[in-house]
Amino acid sequence: MSSTIDLPKGDSPTLALVHPTEEEQLIQSKLNGAEWRGALSHSAYLRREATLSQQALTKEGGITYWILVDTALKNNPLDPNSGTRLPLASCETYRKKALVWRDGKLQEAVSHGIGSVFCGQHLRKRGYAQRLMAEVGKALRTHQTDEKRECLFTVLYSDIGKKFYANFGWEPFPSSHIALPASATTPAASLPTARPLYAEDLPELCRLDEALIRKSLESRPQGSKTAVALVPDVETVQWHHAREEFVGQEVHGKVPKIKGAIVGDEVGKRVWCYWTRVWYNEDVSIVKGNTMHILRLVVEDDALGSEDAQEGGGHGAAIAALLAMAQREAEEWKTEHVEVWSPSAAALAGAQILDKSARVIERDSESIASLLWYPEHEGRAADQLDWISNEKYSWC
């Protein structure tokens, strides 16, 4: 049927970006679920999406759904009696707290993370995804802003390389990680003691983390590049964990309780991280591809890259202790490896204490951190901005 539908090309003036009804959103969720459900059944995927839309991060306008439609159509030609419009392409955006330092001043801003960009196979090759992104880029400039908080940038993570989204302003930024295999083996090195973190530990740590980021930005030398950061607030972390817990319950019949690890007792001198587990395989015996992601790694006194870290002591050893616990959790929860995004020198040193072959991997096709900078500028924004704390917690 789809080959006979007379639909306009993506540059048609009759196309418009709108918010879908619940029925129209369900059309897209059913289609993209067939491609993205991973370890979940199709029905469980739909339930997960509904669950994630009601988290602290997403409820009350935290998530916005967008579809591209043809306003010239009187009904959905694929289902004329449904009362719905035909979604030509779709995405969702997540409202995020952001900080921007420029010209010596720190300001709070609204940002948005873009996810689930989708065009059904029967509607591809017509330019709909391109038109969607062009329209979304314009719409987000003023979406959910007010006189106190403007939107200066938006982000997305591309799984289709660096070129497509760059055509619409989302420039690729450095995207790297280190990976360690899951392991239940006790490290040979003598390491500090790492204690587990649980959900109730995270709100206070996230508040402290935001304060540390603010302090770091405010102390940037005059003349430094403009710097941006998405705030790693507890609402963001809880969204990742709600996703993890839903899939854990569906696939393994239980939810993970340990959310991270911490080394040290004195506030201001601790090293800690929190993580999430991602499963991709319906067959729970298959671990290939399943990943334990370190969402955020924090060194409270910010002494990354120090000499003792490079020598395997100090922060390098503390980070190794955190990663060793992550490896054990990864093994227990049937994930293949542990990933740390945008690793510091100390993070790499810590990883190499556990695995001498650990190295920084530059991504060039998947999970490419991409940012659209709205203020007027010449040349590549990626050359003029520092994206601070560009870690997995920012992904959506």
Question: Could you say what each language-model-derived stretch is?
Answer:
Residues 157, 163-190, 282-396:
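Active-site/acyl-donor-binding loops of N-acyltransferases
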Residues 124-137, 315-319, 323:
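Glycine-rich acyl-CoA binding loop
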Residues 68, 93, 119, 275-277:
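GNAT/GCN5-related N-acetyltransferase fold signature
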Residues 117-119, 152-158, 338-340:
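Conserved hydrophobic beta-strand within the GNAT/NAT acetyltransferase core sheet
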Residues 71-84, 142-149, 249-254, 260, ...:
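Intrinsically disordered, low-complexity domain-flanking/linker segments in eukaryotic proteins
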Residues 2, 7-29:
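Long, serine/threonine/proline-rich intrinsically disordered regions in eukaryotic cortical polarity
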Residues 30-103, 218-267:
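Active-site rim helix/loop that mediates acceptor-substrate recognition in acyltransferases
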Residues 176-296:
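Amide-forming acyltransferase catalytic core, primarily the GNAT-like/NAT-type
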